């Protein structure tokens, strides 16, 4: 009788132990399934890898922001494009003070020619390259029919326009160029303007007045090496270093000053 009771107690203990093991195994399986779902939602990245990736993105943004801030720190106040260096224009926002900004390249939006970089101009709100068509000689229109001179029996020069290509008209030679017009020498421009290089062309540009940025000629004949020339200062002015205590970093900037 006692042996029978002992066998029953041992079988009950075994059943209880088996039940406990089954419950623990089911809990472990569910926890593993949850962990796998979390990993799949992260795209296979561990929490440490995700943290490193976010830290790298933050560092990249911080580097870009510091670079942008450096460029903005180089700008200085202005009131017109003439006060800015070559390759910059005076940007006047609706809110805030005006400052010299880097010129805009071709196919960039613009509102005026001064915003575009040298050798480009603003056309329909877009910076486009300056074509060489403005330098081509005037080609007279051909009538299609040629009439003989009644007195001599020869063709008139007006009808044979193709024989006069490249010969400037006398009326056109007396017209003085305005700002932006093509020229060969300063005498081709109106008073107060000079003929200066604008990349591969030469156009009429205004003579510089007091306070405007100028180019100091260090060597004789170096004017011809400039791609984007400025006119000389007006009479009674000289191109000197701009000395201003508020802008010590711009000590090398030259402006037209009284002699």
UniProtKB/Swiss-Prot annotation:
| Biological process (GO), any one | positive regulation of canonical Wnt signaling pathway
What are the recorded GO MF terms, alphabetically? co-receptor binding; receptor antagonist activity
Q: Name one GO cellular component term.
A: extracellular space
Question: Which residue ranges are recorded for the region named DKK-type Cys-2?
Answer: 183-256
Annotated Pfam families: Dickkopf_N (PF04706), DIKK1-2-4_C-subdom1 (PF21481), DIKK1-2-4_C-subdom2 (PF21479)
Tissue range of expression? Expressed in heart, brain, skeletal muscle and lung.
**Source domain of life:** Eukaryota
Q: Where in the cell is it found?
A: Secreted
**What are the start and end residues of every segment in region (DKK-type Cys-1)?**
78-127
Cystine residue pairs: 183-195, 189-204, 194-231, 214-239, 233-256
Q: Which residues form the signal peptide?
A: 1-33
Any keyword Metal-binding?
Answer: no
Major location, coarse class? secreted
Q: Do the record's keywords include Disulfide bond? A: yes
Concerning PTM, the database record says: May be proteolytically processed by a furin-like protease.
Glycosylation, residue list: 52
Q: Which UniProt keywords apply?
A: Developmental protein, Disulfide bond, Glycoprotein, Secreted, Signal, Wnt signaling pathway
Oligomeric state and interaction partners are given as: Interacts with LRP5 and LRP6.
Per the record, what about its domains?
The C-terminal cysteine-rich domain mediates interaction with LRP5 and LRP6.
Family, per entry: Belongs to the dickkopf family.
> What is this protein's function per UniProt?
Antagonizes canonical Wnt signaling by inhibiting LRP5/6 interaction with Wnt and by forming a ternary complex with the transmembrane protein KREMEN that promotes internalization of LRP5/6. DKKs play an important role in vertebrate development, where they locally inhibit Wnt regulated processes such as antero-posterior axial patterning, limb development, somitogenesis and eye formation. In the adult, Dkks are implicated in bone formation and bone disease, cancer and Alzheimer disease.
**Stated name of the protein:** Dickkopf-related protein 2
Gene name, per UniProt, is DKK2
């Amino acid at each position: 009788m006692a042996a029978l009771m002992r066998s029953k107690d041992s079988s009950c203990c075994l059943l209880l132990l088996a039940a406990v093991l089954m419950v623990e195994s089911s809990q472990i399986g569910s926890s593993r399934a949850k962990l796998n779902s979390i990993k799949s939602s992260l795209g296979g990245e561990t929490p440490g890898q995700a943290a490193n990736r976010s830290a790298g993105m933050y560092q990249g943004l911080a580097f870009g922001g510091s670079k942008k801030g450096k460029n903005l720190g180089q700008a200085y106040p202005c009131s017109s494009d003439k006060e800015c260096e070559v390759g910059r224009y005076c940007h006047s926002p609706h809110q805030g003070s005006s400052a010299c900004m880097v010129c805009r390249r071709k196919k960039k939006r613009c509102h005026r020619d001064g915003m575009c970089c040298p050798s480009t101009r603003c056309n329909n709100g877009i910076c486009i390259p300056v074509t060489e068509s403005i330098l081509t000689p005037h080609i007279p229109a051909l009538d299609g029919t040629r009439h003989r001179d009644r007195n001599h029996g020869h063709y008139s020069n007006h009808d044979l326009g193709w024989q006069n290509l490249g010969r400037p008209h006398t009326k056109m030679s007396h017209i003085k160029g305005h700002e932006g017009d093509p020229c060969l020498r300063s005498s081709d421009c109106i008073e107060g303007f000079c003929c200066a290089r604008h990349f591969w062309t030469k156009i009429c540009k205004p003579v510089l007045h007091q306070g405007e940025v100028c180019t100091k000629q260090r060597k004789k004949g170096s004017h011809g090496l400039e791609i984007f020339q400025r006119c000389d200062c007006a009479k009674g002015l000289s191109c000197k270093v701009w000395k201003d205590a508020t802008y010590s970093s711009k000590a090398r900037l030259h402006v037209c000053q009284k002699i």
